[in-house]
Curated annotation (Swiss-Prot):
This is Junctional sarcoplasmic reticulum protein 1. Residues 165-180 have a biased composition (Low complexity). It is found in: Sarcoplasmic reticulum membrane; Endoplasmic reticulum membrane. Residues 326-337 have a biased composition (Basic residues). Residues 214-225 have a biased composition (Acidic residues). Residues 23-125, 159-337 are annotated as: Disordered. Interacts with CACNA1S, CACNB1 and calsequestrin. It comes from Bos taurus (Bovine). Keywords: Endoplasmic reticulum, Membrane, Sarcoplasmic reticulum.
Length: 337
């Protein structure tokens, strides 16, 4: 039974069907190169060998009772597979098929970027950063400014002259001795006139002068004589002032007193009679005459009308009535007496 099944399978998968399929593939596009036809034949041979191996495995594992029915089904499957493979090859004109194993390998290994090179290897300065450079530059600037300030200070000291030693410092170091008298300034001693020669005095006497001029000359001559007896060097300023004689009082000329002129007495204004002096306000008023000289606010001082009247009357001074007309104050803006 097994041998029969193998023969049927061989008869079903004969070379006639494969040749027909190859002729059908070659007829529609005769202009293709021979390389495409060779590839197609190799693919069909591979597919037929795979299907044949699978059928052999099935027949070996199946029981004897089912040998007649299954080979017929298996004969139909490879034909349909061959036709479907030929149609796919027509659609893909010359495109090389990719195996699923290659696709999995490509997806599994993603492209990794190369690691960045080490900075210490490329940069010559190593670990230096921008902050370190800034700190170093600021330190250099500070040192430069300090050096410049020191240089200016040294230049000023050289330009300034050396201080001259004072005289009092040397005198303190010397041994104590008699205190040197300082020369007295000329302003202390009063100026003393030198005595005039006698020739000049005679000339002055010959010139006629008034009595006052003669007295002056005598006084000057006396002062000159006193100054000759006392030496100038031995006298101090205070002694000179004491020894000076007081000046003589000169009799001044008496001016004739002016005669006292009699003062002119202004004529006084004639005094007016008492009745004319009193102002018109002093006359009795009508309402006083009617009421018998009694004022209304004397009766009821609590009434509001009476208060107003009192305020109006109080503005007027009581002394105005008694004053005469001549002594009353003048009103501003009027030239009346």
């Amino acid at each position: 039974m097994a041998t029969r099944a193998m023969e049927e399978l061989d008869g079903g998968l004969g070379s006639c069907q494969v040749d027909e399929d190859l002729s059908a593939l070659a007829d529609p596009c005769p202009s293709r190169p021979q390389e495409d036809s060779v590839r197609a034949t190799s693919r069909l041979a591979d597919s037929s060998s795979r299907s044949h191996d699978s059928q052999e495995r099935v027949t070996e594992g199946s029981p004897t009772g089912s040998v007649d029915t299954k080979p017929k089904k298996m004969e139909k499957e490879p034909v349909s597979k061959v036709t479907s493979g030929a149609g796919k090859e027509k659609l893909k004109a010359g495109a090389t098929p990719r195996s699923p194993a290659r696709k999995k390998a490509q997806t599994a290994s993603p492209t990794q970027p190369p690691p960045p090179p080490a900075l210490s290897d490329e940069l010559p300065w190593g670990d230096l950063t921008l902050n370190k450079c800034l700190v170093l530059a600021s330190l250099v600037a500070l040192l430069g400014s300090a050096f410049q300030l020191c240089r200016e200070a040294v230049a000023r000291d050289v330009e300034a002259p050396a201080p001259v030693p004072e005289s009092w410092a040397s005198s303190s170091s010397s041994p104590k001795g008699p205190a040197s008298t300082l020369p007295k300034p000329e302003a202390w001693a009063p100026s003393v006139r030198q005595p005039e020669p006698p020739s000049k005095l005679e000339e002055r006497v010959q010139i006629p002068r008034s009595e006052e001029a003669a007295e002056k000359d005598e006084w000057e001559s006396e002062e000159a004589a006193d100054g000759e007896h006392v030496p100038l060097a031995g006298r101090g300023p205070k002694e000179k002032l004491k020894k000076e004689k007081p000046r003589k009082e000169r009799p001044g000329k008496e001016k004739p007193q002016k005669e006292e002129r009699p003062r002119k007495e202004k004529p006084r204004k004639e005094e007016k009679p008492r009745g004319a002096r009193e102002p018109q306000g002093a006359l009795p008023r009508r309402w006083e005459a009617r009421e018998g000289g009694h004022r209304p606010w004397g009766r009821d001082s609590g009434a509001p009308e009476d208060r107003k009247r009192q305020a109006w009357v109080s503005l007027r001074r009581p002394d105005e009535e008694d004053r005469p007309l001549g002594r009353q104050k003048r009103r501003a803006g009027k030239g009346r007496d």
